């Protein structure tokens, strides 16, 4: 088992990575401080893992909320479903929420935990690759709004993260590939050696070799933990983790949540960010081609939707959370393993690449 620690002083917490973690309930129980537990999951994950998890939490009073699956369900209505469930069953401040699912479940459960009675404990058990390498770590919680992705939320850290590699065996290939976009992101933005490792291990990753997947997930979580520890509220370096997300969030909002998976939108967003770097003479053509090739190796989209041009992108980008004083801010790769935040991108350059 790999155990990482996200160091945030009193709010520090462990990240456990192993096979069969969902069955290691003694470890899970050690992070639950009182008798009452509510598991939040969805109608895809519940038949796979919910009953077995509940059966092992025999020392606790456990109930559950089962939401519909999909990005479109990460909304204020389902946030209210969770809150109403907790109130109806008279859960108190000592209740622990467990997020059992992918990024949508983790985000909405974390936000409910942040808000219910001004804050209760929650634990992440991410079951998708994307949530394991990115969204379960770092304390970003939110729901979507029709006018923008993740526009209603809070920074609120979990008590622990349990990453069970075995859950990837039930993950559809499209979801796995979408998660690879976030994996590749770490290599592009700040770790050339990891990017090279990914290039060398494409076949092993696609084959689902557990040792390779464990190594890959641990590397991503360590990178995320290091960045979050130095900049929890995204006032500086943490913004680099949004590589591809300025374009990606615009795609998701314009196309309708769930039409494109988040990782698919981020994949295209990273290619567009690299094109922006090319247009600004900040990135070598050879480096751009390697970025595009690695993303394509996992059957991820690399071009924007045909019904989106400059006008559609800019409408959503103006609401981007990274903007400061009305200026659009972009995360741009300047080389494989290097990136920077720029607020000097001209509209002419944007129109050129879009």
UniProtKB/Swiss-Prot annotation:
Protein's GO biological process: amino acid biosynthetic process; aromatic amino acid family biosynthetic process; chorismate biosynthetic process
One GO MF term attached to the UniProt entry: nucleotide binding
Broad enzyme group: lyase
Alphabetical keyword list: Amino-acid biosynthesis, Aromatic amino acid biosynthesis, Cobalt, Cytoplasm, Lyase, Metal-binding, NAD, Nucleotide-binding, Zinc
Cofactor list: Co(2+); Zn(2+); NAD(+)
EC id: 4.2.3.4
Residue positions binding NAD(+): 69-74, 103-107, 127-128, 140, 149
CDD domains listed in its UniProt record: DHQS
Entry-linked Pfam families: DHQ_synthase, DHQS_C
Catalyzed chemical reaction(s): 7-phospho-2-dehydro-3-deoxy-D-arabino-heptonate = 3-dehydroquinate + phosphate
Keyword Amino-acid biosynthesis: yes
Keyword Nucleotide-binding: yes
Compartments, as annotated in UniProt: Cytoplasm
GO cellular component: cytoplasm
Pathway per the UniProt entry: Metabolic intermediate biosynthesis; chorismate biosynthesis; chorismate from D-erythrose 4-phosphate and phosphoenolpyruvate: step 2/7
S-S pairs: none
Domain of life: Bacteria
Main location: cytoplasm
SUPFAM superfamilies: Dehydroquinate synthase-like (SSF56796)
Summary of the function given for this chain in its UniProt record: Catalyzes the conversion of 3-deoxy-D-arabino-heptulosonate 7-phosphate (DAHP) to dehydroquinate (DHQ).
Family to which the UniProt record says this protein belongs: Belongs to the sugar phosphate cyclases superfamily. Dehydroquinate synthase family.
NCBIfam families reported for this sequence: aroB (TIGR01357)
HAMAP family assigned: DHQ_synthase (MF_00110)
Protein's name according to its UniProt entry: 3-dehydroquinate synthase
Organism this protein belongs to: Colwellia psychrerythraea (strain 34H / ATCC BAA-681) (Vibrio psychroerythus)
